[in-house]
Amino acid sequence: MNSIEFPLLDRTTQNSVISTTPNDLSNWSRLSSLWPLLYGTSCCFIEFASLIGSRFDFDRYGLVPRSSPRQADLILTAGTVTMKMAPSLVRLYEQMPEPKYVIAMGACTITGGMFSTDSYSTVRGVDKLIPVDVYLPGCPPKPEAVIDAITKLRKKVSREIYEDRIWPQQESRCFTTNHKFHVGRSTHTGNYDQGLLYQSPSTSEIPSEIFFKYKSSVSSHELVN
């Protein structure tokens, strides 16, 4: 039995009878065997590596790190996500089987961190690419905070109704790389429409003919001087 939420045994009945529903049985089995795909890009991931040791022993939660997204039902993002890495992250998420969950670990993953103020190549929050279930703030978060986030995710899984989670996500998801919320169809290939790609404000409104003509004239002027 799992002591998180909703035990399978109905205590109003006799001890020889177990009363439950298929949905509760599915939730109980999934929350006890979350297999994470580790997507670490920066220093926050070093704190997560501490959980593998004997002091915290995250194996007791049924966590088995996987190297393939097709074998994982949880992706844990830690560190800065750049614009070039955004399609790869979306592709990994789309390759995970349903139901799947996301934990955003660290300030850089949640808001872009200190790189989001004047950087044109940093995604301002991973939730602009994939839906996030648990936010874990910190720079970096402590291993105890990671365990608390996993516990909260297990509680969420135990209360979940499978149909209510699957159908809304298949109809509309947020996929964009220009730091703005955009609801559209699912992207199963990791490719983006050209209209969603980020463009520099200095050249986005200039026609290509005028821009390249101006650039060539500047280059020739520098050569003359």
Swiss-Prot record:
Query: In terms of one coarse class, where is the protein primarily found?
Result: plastid
Cofactor requirements of the protein: [4Fe-4S] cluster
Cellular component, GO annotation: chloroplast thylakoid membrane; respiratory chain complex I
* Keyword 4Fe-4S among record annotations: yes
A GO MF annotation of the entry reads: quinone binding
According to the lineage, what is the superkingdom?
Eukaryota
**What is catalyzed by this enzyme?**
a plastoquinone + NADH + (n+1) H(+)(in) = a plastoquinol + NAD(+) + n H(+)(out); a plastoquinone + NADPH + (n+1) H(+)(in) = a plastoquinol + NADP(+) + n H(+)(out)
Q: What is its EC number?
A: 7.1.1.-
GO biological process, alphabetically ordered? aerobic respiration; electron transport coupled proton transport; photosynthesis, light reaction
Q: Which Pfam families match?
A: Oxidored_q6 (PF01058)
PANTHER family, A to Z: NADH DEHYDROGENASE (PTHR11995), NADH DEHYDROGENASE [UBIQUINONE] IRON-SULFUR PROTEIN 7, MITOCHONDRIAL (PTHR11995:SF14)
Summary of subunit composition and partner proteins: NDH is composed of at least 16 different subunits, 5 of which are encoded in the nucleus.
Name of the protein in question: NAD(P)H-quinone oxidoreductase subunit K, chloroplastic
Which organism is this protein's natural source? Platanus occidentalis (Sycamore)
The organism's taxonomy opens as: Eukaryota, Viridiplantae, Streptophyta, Embryophyta, Tracheophyta
The record's gene field reads ndhK
